[in-house]
Amino acid sequence: MNLCSSGATASTTSLSSTGQRNGGTSEGGGEGAGGGGGSGGGGGNSSNDGPSEAIHCFGSNGGGGGPEEVFHTSHSHSTANGGGGGGSSNGHSQQHNENNATMPPETRPKMVTVKHPESNKPKPTTKKSKPIQADQDVIKALQRCRDEGIKRLDLSKSSITVIPSTVKECVHLTELYLYSNKIGQLPAEIGCLVNLRNLALNENSLTSLPESLQNCKQLKVLDLRHNKLAEIPPVIYRLRTLTTLYLRFNRITAVADNLRQLVNLTMLSLRENKIRELGSAIGALVNLTTLDVSHNHLEHLPEDIGNCVNLSALDLQHNELLDIPDSIGNLKSLVRLGLRYNRLSSVPATLKNCKSMDEFNVEGNGMTQLPDGMLASLSGLTTITLSRNQFTSYPTGGPAQFTNVYSINLEHNRIDKIPYGIFSRAKGLTKLNMKENMLTALPLDIGTWVNMVELNLATNALQKLPDDIMNLQNLEILILSNNMLKKIPNTIGNMRKLRILDLEENRIEVLPHEIGLLHELQRLILQTNQITMLPRSIGHLSNLTHLSVSENNLQFLPEEIGSLEGLENLYINQNPGLEKLPFELALCQNLKYLNIDKCPLSTIPPEIQAGGPSLVLQWLKMHSPYRQM
């Protein structure tokens, strides 16, 4: 029955009936494609490495989704996997069972119980017949598509090698999903699908496209990610209705001037190719809102980029850019600009016109300064990342440049001081990373950073901490490793919200008794210092799970360590004076890892030590004078 001609909602089909499909793999980038629709929507993977942009295609009953990708210019790699959208799907496994039930006995997969190694050997014909069976299934799916007037067809992840010419009969199709197959070329008959609006061909082996594709004059979304294209197929330049074009992860080396014909494009991804030049044609794409040309070999941008006045996300990271044109200042709608890991020594002062930007990230360049007052002009900034450059001082512009900022990263530069009062207006500043600089002291007004939550001052030359650090009562993470600190002020006990305290590789000899007041502390890292004893108050750290005191001068552990019931990891290795462990350590029932290497423990037999934490704890318990209690 033809559902379309009868007035019913157009159906959707796939090789696994109407069930759910997951999108292909993604590796970041401002892209989203493929399936989804209706009440479902295309799912997939998301990662933090490109402009936030996702496309969900339209369908009646939901269904399979291509990969959905999001990029952020910050150096973050946290990922989350989302499932492919499905309108009324019960999941892939249920589909599999349903399909098995409806397949003829001769093609139904068999359940095999392995009794002998020989029975697990695959049949010689199994692998050879799979592509043939897949291609036969395609023929059946196309017949059904033709007979029922189906508008949405999902043949993704089906091991298809060839699309038969009978595809021309599926003239009702508006969406065709062929991603994650083994297709080397498309038949010319694909051009007969004149109603096609969405075509997903990502994750195949395409090297070209047929010229007949130009007949698909309603095509809006074309996904060609992860193929083997050495150039942008010429026919693409004639698809003037395209609004979204994904060409990520191919082998493209150049962009033809004909690109200017695609004036309706709003999203263009050329990420992860081999492009060395982006011509002036890019300036004709005045409707672009997202442009991703990251991970290429660009050294320059054309001035014409300034004509793309609707751009909100421009990702240029991981190229070889030597400069940015002044015309970048015309992009007043720009929210995110990715410039990480290029070869920039400066950025144009005109960037101060891009007042919609909420993030400024130039990590991994060769910059020594920013234009005067530029950051202050970008009053909407909330995140500033200047790490891994050659800055010797804070940018000029005074406190005004950090008014609305909550995160500042200046890691791995050559800055020797934090100016007094520089954060006096930064009432929302919660995260400051000054790791790997040349700081010798902290500013006297550090006590005014009252909203700070995370402070990283590792790998500097700090010799002391000011007493005013006690005012940072919202601080949860304090990293002071690899400095020259000899002591910790008693006032540290006022920082009651601390969860992580890292003091590794300093010159500390004594810990203050007040450290026992840090009841929220979960990780205490003290390794590579000169500590001779731990304060008895350490037993009050009821939330401590990780304690590292290796490479010190400990003579003993306090009995109170037995109160750390939540302790999971204890590092006391390489303490040459530590000859015995307290029996109370056996009370740490959750201890999973105990490192006692290179400690001259004379009381515990070597074979017990070699047996791991549980055996050591058992031995301590058995030999404890309190064991009868």
UniProtKB/Swiss-Prot annotation:
The keyword Aminoacyl-tRNA synthetase does not apply. Residues 21-45 have a biased composition (Gly residues). LRR repeats lie at residues 149-170, 172-193, 195-217, 218-239, 241-262, 264-285, 287-308, 310-331, 333-355, 356-377, 380-401, 404-425, 428-449, 451-472, 474-495, 497-518, 520-541, 543-564, 566-588, 590-611. Gene3D superfamilies: Ribonuclease Inhibitor. Residues 1-133 are annotated as: Disordered. Residues 1-19 have a biased composition (Low complexity). It holds the Pfam family LRR_14. Keywords: Leucine-rich repeat, Repeat. InterPro entries: Leu-rich_rpt, Leu-rich_rpt_typical-subtyp, LRR-SigEffector_domain, LRR_dom_sf, LRR_R13L4/SHOC2-like. PANTHER family: LEUCINE-RICH REPEAT AND IQ DOMAIN-CONTAINING PROTEIN 4, LEUCINE-RICH REPEAT-CONTAINING. Acts as a Ras effector and participates in MAPK pathway activation. Probably acts as a regulatory subunit of protein phosphatase that specifically dephosphorylates Raf kinase and stimulate Raf activity at specialized signaling complexes upon Ras activation. Belongs to the SHOC2 family. This is Leucine-rich repeat protein soc-2 homolog. It comes from Drosophila pseudoobscura pseudoobscura (Fruit fly).
